[in-house]
Amino acid sequence: MQPTEDLPRGTPLSSTGHPLPRRTSPEQSVTLRHHQLARDASLKASLGSAPPNDSNENSSSPRRASSGESHETGQSDAKKWFNQSNQNPTATFDSNAMDVDPPFFQKESDSSNEDKPYQFPPATIRIQSNARSSSADDYRSVIDDLTVEIQKLKEELKRYKQRGPDMLRKDKLFEIKIHGLPKRKKRELEATLREFTATLEGSPNTSSSKRNSTTKPSRHATRDRMYSGSGSKSQSKHASSSSGSHTRPVDSAYASMSTGAGSSGTSLNRPQGGSRFKTNEQKVDHYLREIPEGLYPRFVSMTEKEKKKLVVRRLEQIFTGKIGGKHVRRTQPTLTPAVSIALPAVQATSIDFSPQQQQQQQQQQQQQPKSNFITNPGATFSSVPEPLREARILPQEHQYGHVAGQKGRSHDIGSASNSNEDQTESGGNGNSSSNGNDSGTNPSPPMPPPPEQRPTRPRDLDPDRIQIPSENMEYIRHLGLVPPELLTNPPERTSFDFHPDEEGWVYLNLLCNMAQLHIMSVTPDFVRNAVVDLSAKFQLSPDGRKIRWRGGTDGTKFSSESSGDLSQRSPETDDTENTKGDNHKRQKTGHSTGDSGSSGNNLPKFGGPQVSASSESFHYKPLFLHQQSPNEQSSMEDGTLSSFGPIEESNADSRWGQSGSGASNRRKRRRDGAIIYYSGAPFCTDLSGDPGDTSPATYMLSSERERPDAQGQFARPLPFRSGSGSSITRRPLSDAHLNLGSIPKLQLLNEGVSIPELVTDSGDESSKLSMEFPWSDEPQILEVRPLEPCGLGGVRPEDHFMVVVTTRRSKLDARVGQRLEGQRKLSEEMTDIVVNRLATMSTSSPRPSVRRLSNMSDSSKIKIEYLSGRIKRLEPVSLPPPAIFFPPFSADSCSEDDFGSDGDDEFNSSEEFMSRRANPHQSDDYPDGVDLSSGDEDGEEPEDDIDASRMVDDMSLPGLGRVPRGSQASTEVVPGSSRGRSNSASAEAVLRAGGSSAATAGGVESDFSISSSQG
């Protein structure tokens, strides 16, 4: 480097002569000089403060003394710290001093002892400050996460919130959104909420401010009364815990919850009073003694098949009341009729028992006195009934305003079953479900309304409890969506015979919850697979959301249950149900749906007449769900309909995934709007609307009646899928390696079209061909796929026909040797191609001609022989409802085929042009994929083998002949070519009259056109 005296003269240069960058030497650097001065000052300050650190070693830490006697003050002063830092800036370079000397240092002390010096040891101070800072950081992270989550929720609420009219916004009470609720239930809910809001203050003119000012004190008073039992205790507890403590104050909510079992029970429940509520002296040991074994965790190793069997048994137990299997607890829990403790006098006054029934009731009460006390230790034998566990299900008379006091009371008693301790049927202690039916023949004085609901006990949730099918059916019927008055010509039936869905469909999610399948940790897809694979009593809907019981009193019998250790019902269950059946036979005086023995009369009605499921189920996951309704709406819009039309029975067991139903639900969810109610207003604003324009009664027909014909035209057939998931019926490129016999035969969905069996002509030529080349003569059933009218092309609804072609094709599975030979030829051809390309690249010569794979294609193509063909006229299709009307552009407008009339004189003559003007519905070209001519390229005319007696409309297709063995199977006809017109001149008029008709090669599939008129 150059010496320093040369630097001011100009730019410094390096040893090589290049100018150095714009920077000064280290000796003249201002930054380095300041750093050196600061380092020297910090060293002097540390050496000068060392003696005070040694003298005050016990009072403060050495690191705190470096900031200048800040340890002498009891609490740091921000102003003093700021002045001291400015006066002694060199001390700030000490990292140790900056770590422990923040501007605000607050001691952990109360206001009463602020003047006392801070005398904690240094180590203790460091530990406490670190702990405090770490806990604060933890809470800060939680608070930040919650803040971000709240912001996201607010944004989402703004996105989904729908504002009503601005003038009514100040009087807005609340808004609701309805998802999947049927129309009738939605109307009932809207009417109830309208009446509630209109009569909230008794006058529509009442302002919202008055209502809020009058209702708020009453709400606060009610809340104060509810929490008055534990208010004083919680306050005293909170005061004692917070006084004199140096920890964080305890939140009042946690303080009220931590006051013990007694106070927590009274603070969260309703106010005490009367003998109907339990006392707070119930011990924990009694509660633990009530927990059944089924609620304890079971570590049982099961295979997937065994778990599927258990799932099926749980679901079938709801309808049969029986369960078996090696993984089920063999000893069923002892039936503890807890209702009999509190209702002996009630039952004696409301029901007239025979002497035998009274004797059995007394024997049962004597056999289980201890278990009753364990189940309900606070209960006493009195005439006051115990609160019911379940919500009361009022009879139909009460729901429509009729007075039926005794029937409602007896039915309320019967609705308290479905729990393990409330099973009064099995022990013979009166048929609870038949009480509602026997009330007409056993008159008794009306009873007062039952008390409030009691809390759910652990025994009520026992998964191994014996299910009562009648009570389960009554619970499902109560969730029914179709009243009898909405049905056309409703049959004469009682309220107990009415089904929630006339076809018996119940939501699978409901049955999974009733069977408590969540304990087994199974997914809904696993439950669907288990039902489809193993159950013989359930039928799954095509969308997989609903399930139907086929009827009967016995569940599915598995092959493993034939052994002695696995039975369908346990011995104790057998004895119980036999006793139950005998008691019901004695107690029946009218209609009864009491036990599983008599439930056979009702279960077939619930399920309806069932048709056996199709043996061929779809093992694919569809990309799109083809809806059956004309407006493409989800089936959950009407809760009673899962699917209708002929697709329901043929594809009942199809295992559909969640993509189809999920897409329909998402499509419907976007249309869901809010229903806004206003204060004192007799109306509401409904932004959701009514999806669909079809009456609900249309879909609520039972399976016994005939369905309307209007639904048939909207029922779309499900697409056919091959083994690999393709929707193409015949795959000419890959069927050579497959077995054609594995393709399932398609059913003819359109029953109005009768297609005769397709047979071959018996001739000498065909017999000669069969000697050296095998042919397949098996008749096949064609699939008729209806095409919706689109209104394009100028065709009319009468142009609805189908081309039926009889073909004969070879059996490709017998040509394994030729396939291997073709592969060898293919390898030779590829070798020649590579050699030719290499020769072209090396010599730069013109590319030689490459041999085509004509020999290969001739030896491996599919041989199809057309034997006969005919035109089948179909019924005209109905036009879709017009969306918008387009008037004609001009009066003398013709079809779009006229635009190409004067374009090429070689292919369009004046006669053809005039014929098209005479018939404007003709088309210049053939539809795509149509092959009605099979002549070879030498111009050979095909033979005419069409039988005139088999023609429907006296129209022939002479172009359908035989294909020679050496020619290509499907000769493509170029649209508008002379060869295409010459070979099929007689069929031209037929094809042009119908728009698009197709006869696929092989006769596997035949498409037809459904056309509509313009506009």
Curated annotation (Swiss-Prot):
Protein's name according to its UniProt entry: Frequency clock protein
Chain intervals with Basic and acidic residues compositional bias: 69-80, 107-117, 454-465
Ranges of compositional bias, category Pro residues: 443-453
Motif Nuclear localization signal in this chain: 584-588
Gene coding for it: FRQ
Biased composition (Acidic residues): 895-909, 934-946
Low complexity compositional bias, start-end: 49-68, 203-216, 228-267, 356-368, 431-442, 590-600, 976-1003
Job of this protein: Circadian clock component involved in the generation of biological rhythms, in particular in rhythm stability, period length, and temperature compensation. Behaves as a negative element in circadian transcriptional loop.
Gene Ontology terms: cellular component: cytoplasm; nucleus
Domain of life: Eukaryota
Subcellular location: Nucleus
Record region (Disordered): 1-138, 183-285, 352-383, 402-465, 544-614, 629-668, 706-728, 895-1015
